[in-house]
Amino acid sequence: MLDRRTLMGGILSMAGSKATGAALPGRRLRVFVATLGTETNSFSPLPTGLDAFRATMLWRPGEHPDFATEATGPLWAARERAREGRYEVIEGTCAFAMPGGPVSAQAYQLLRDEILDQLRRAMPVDIVAFGLHGAMLAFGEDECEADLLERARAIVGPDVALGAELDLHAHLSQRLVRAADVLVAFKYYPHIDYVERARDLLDLLERIRAGEIMPTSSLFNCQMVAGLATQSSPMKELVADLFEFERRGEVLSGSLIQGFRAGDVARMGSKVLIYTNNDQPAAASIAQDFGRRYQAMASIMKGNGPERSFAADIELAKAATAYPVILVDSSDNPGGGASGDNMALARAMLDNDLVPSCIGPIWDPLAVQLGFEAGLGADFSLRVGGKVGEASGLPLDVRGKITGLAENVTQNLQGSRPPLGRVVCISTAGLDIIVSEIRDQCYGPDMFRALGVEPANKRYVAVKSSEQWRIGFGDMGRSVIYVASSQQSSIRHYHKRSRPMWPFEPV
């Protein structure tokens, strides 16, 4: 059966067609933008309901603050063009939750339908652009993004240009690709390019609406899942080559989707998505070429071959001679849906005299409350962490001093300010433990500095993160050691993911 793009081919090539209406001189494009997303960890004990969205992002039309966020790049880019007189922007709800467990059916349906009702009221429009993540799962719906896009298409019809920006840790499927005219994912990890990719998305949607291009896609399944930083070789060169294909015009858009291994769904995995201008054989060939190169490099990259034991990680840290050493507790990263309250690394730092040092953020609202009750300077016994679930492990009983208290602490994330709420620093035996009221990962040193702790003066700096910490720390660390404190991979039991998939099975 011919898909919508094939049927549109004749229409797009006709002079004076309806699609060319977007290019009429003097007319601003009517553009609807909204956001709905989270990154769902199927194994997280943390429920994701409406309160989780309220705690992170639940901005109704007109409430989006005057800065860009990872989740709302399309809205920000559309506002830029509205200021230039090019767009009439109709803003929908922007909703995003800190990664956790599956979204409740009630929360997902309420937010989805709220956005779709806003779209109905906005009609007629020329363009619909969503900020999505790509790895959002809800009870009763394993493909939230495709579901939203399909329902949006039913509202706007075939002639409106419809697309979305995705995180590169998305789960891609043919259903999701078919649901949009074009999908554009971040190219960098850490995620530093969400505004640029949102601009790319809008450029493509404008050209689609004007009838200038007909994106034709190919999706290559790498049969693996590998999270690779893009600032170092060989991934750096692969991304650069993809940009070069786009610059030359051979590719309209290309996305290297790394996938998210904590999502237990059939579509989970690393994939390559390529769009060409009505040239499917070329799209398939280019997607396969990049996919094969990605497969070849994965096994030599961090975190994708045989993992060191936690004990070996600590021995490696003890052997360091250049400081500070950044200890990255990626297995307990709140940015991947973990609780952020596993204390194994903090305990090991104390037991092995890895001091002077600091660690954070540890998520423990009760410990924060008790720390504020005790007050600044108090000598205090406090049980920290180990509260949420099996992966949290044992709590750490700390006898120390409250050396820092701060309210309304935020972190700088490329201009946006994700909150940590009230934060406590408890110092014991040379280790400064940063405990936060709101769960989030570490994006940089300002989290420590808000409590009077200077990471540059420490021998060891332990962060609850995976790669996003690099945004703020830059090259502060003389060496970087990735540790696996919670051993979460050992307690994951997949039921839905495809098989075989490397590194779980040989391919």
Curated annotation (Swiss-Prot):
Source organism of the structure: Sphingomonas sp
Signal peptide span: 1-21
Domain of life: Bacteria
Protein's GO biological process: proteolysis
Residues given in the record as Zn(2+) binding sites: 167, 169, 191
UniProt note on regulation of activity: Inhibited by the metal chelators EDTA and 1,10-phenanthroline.
Protein name, as recorded: Microcystinase C
Keyword Protease listed: yes
Annotated coiled-coil segments of the chain: none
Sorted UniProt keywords: Hydrolase, Metal-binding, Metalloprotease, Protease, Signal, Zinc
GO molecular function: metal ion binding; metallopeptidase activity; peptidase activity; zinc ion binding
Family per record: Belongs to the peptidase M81 family.
Entry cofactors: Zn(2+)
Function description: Involved in peptidolytic degradation of cyclic heptapeptide hepatotoxin microcystin (MC). Cleaves both linear MC and the tetrapeptide degradation product of MC. Cleaves the Adda-Glu peptide bond of linear MC heptapeptides.
Cofactor note: Binds 1 zinc ion per subunit.
Alphabetical list of InterPro entries matching this protein: MlrC, MlrC_C, MlrC_N
